[in-house]
Every structure is written in structure tokens, then in C-alpha cells.
Amino acid sequence: SDVYKRQPLIAAGGIASGKAMLAAMILGAEGVQIGSRFAVATESSAHPNFKQQVWKTPEGGTMLALKKIAPTRLIKNEFYEQVKTLEDQGADSDTLKELLGKGRAKQGIFEGNLAEGELEIGQIASMLKGEESVAEIMQDLLRDYNQSINRCSNSVSF
């Protein structure tokens, strides 16, 4: 339809490599949004404690929570456990908003409170192992993207 041709499609979520960028483009995206990898970049204003926690997060160390408000992926910590307990008990959105209304994201991400703060990060957290500058991230993404294109073009035949 003409409506879809006029609107750019941007893929987001789970994209941390050039290979994932290419996959999104092959599926029709015109661009990608990369959040988590840049959230812990050298230039990021995130607290060093938050960055360290992200780099230590194992596969399966994040969970989707706050589904009644806005689905949010969190690193498992004391705050996450409070949210999970309330959700398991059937808490309504007002109760969850009250818990969030205490500046939890600021506490966790920007003040480095790893226990009581909201530690929001994407599901690719376990892939992130150390600090990189934005320039290094971009170079790696483009190198991997171009290598992936070359692999695809060299392996397709009819």
C-alpha cells in the first residue's frame, strides 16, 4: 500500500550487531534503533555502577516487567523482585505507578543504586562485556554489517 511506502520502518529491540542490522533490513526495515549498546558507551551519562551491572548480566538475567503500564525489560534486582511480587499478586496499574513514581529509573541508571533502582536494559545485555566509545561501536557495527552483506552475496546462488 502507498501508506507503507511513505512511512519509514525502523526496527528496534535486540539489535546489537551489524548482522542483526542486516537481518532487519532484509525483513524490510529502512533503519534500526540501537539502545542498550549505546546506553553503556563511554559517552553515556549512565552511572558506572549501572554500566558494570549491565556488563555482568548473564543470559536470562533480564525479565520483562511492568506489563500493565509499559512493558519494560529489567535486570533482576531487589526492585525487580518488588515489581514481580506485586504483579504476581495482581496489582493494578496505579499501584505499580506508585512504586515507579519514586524516581526508580533515575536511582538505578543515573545514580547507580543497584538494589532499589530500576535497571532498565534490553535483552541483549548479556552480549555487552565492556565499555566502548560511540566511535568504536559504530566501527564495529559497520564492519560486521559489511562482512554480513558479503557473506550473504557470496553464498546465494541459483
What are these regions (language model features)?
Residues S1, K5-I10, A16-F158:
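Conserved active-site-proximal phosphate/metal-binding subdomains
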